[in-house]
Amino acid sequence: MIRPPAAWRVAGLALLLATSAASAQQDWPNRPVQIIVPFAAGGSGDVLARVVAQYLTSSLKQQFVVENRPGGGGIIGTKQFLAQPADGYSVGMSSLSTMSLVPIINANAGYDPDHDFAHIAYIGGSPVVLAANPRTGVRTLAEFIAYSNSPGKSFTFASSGVGSDGQLWGELIASSTGVKAEHVPYKATAQALSDLVAGHVQFSTFTLSSTSPFLHAKSLNGIAVTAPERMSEFPELPTFKELGKPDLVGTTWFALSGPLGMSKDIVNRINQAVQMAVATPEGQARFRRDGIIAQPLNADEFTRFVAAENVRWKSLIERVGLVGAQH
């Protein structure tokens, strides 16, 4: 019996493996897909993840299951989905906070947003709203600044943790307006907003999507928002830009990312499904209601977007002195 040369056997094995891998990619998804959310239930990231999971389940004919893994300012959950096999069955909710803020603020984050991930799909961005407990009597930015100078009054703002997007926006707003406020970090957005409504803290800098139910219920006063222009669902809420603060424009964005090495075909399929979900009348209505701004980006465009955001926010973090502030 004549045996084929070793090189032939190796080539045949490589072809077999490549064919098997291609077949697995074509069959994807043939079992439930996990979306790891590095935040507690109830916040903007969690809500968006569940909305997207519902649409992906419908369009890709397989269950997309949200699992919350909060802690460490988003580091715990982010590192968990980063450590999963790059087979498309475990992806994660990424965000401005976990990609552009935490790795700069926390010297021990342990991951590189530009080189360790497959960035899949941008979902949407929510402007941040400066909100006040009504008992402060603060309704305008001028009143906010005046309140900060009132002797004997507690002046605190809540965020969802040290190094969170809420903290950074709060620090930026304080820096831009020349006020000094004490930061009160919480473990979850829902808990912080509950304490704000109860009057345990005076102000907050959360996303409009998280704060909107309280604004509609008049249990919080909206002072100004970081959107580039007034939102159609909140026409009475002024922008910082129109109030003379053009440096306070931007959104807290949310997206899907996965472990480096994911199949380009799977990445593109998820990206296209997310874009289709956002473009549906139901998706657009939900985004308008919650104050979320959509931006259609393919996977390559989103990857470049993340890199640009990292450069932009590093300079802002340096400005407020938070680079490497957390260990």
Predicted feature residues:
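C-terminal lobe and pocket-closing loops
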Residues: 125, 211-279, 308-311, 325-327
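N-terminal (or domain-start) structured segment
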Residues: 24-115, 153-154, 162, 177-202, ...
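Surface-exposed aromatic
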Residues: 286-305
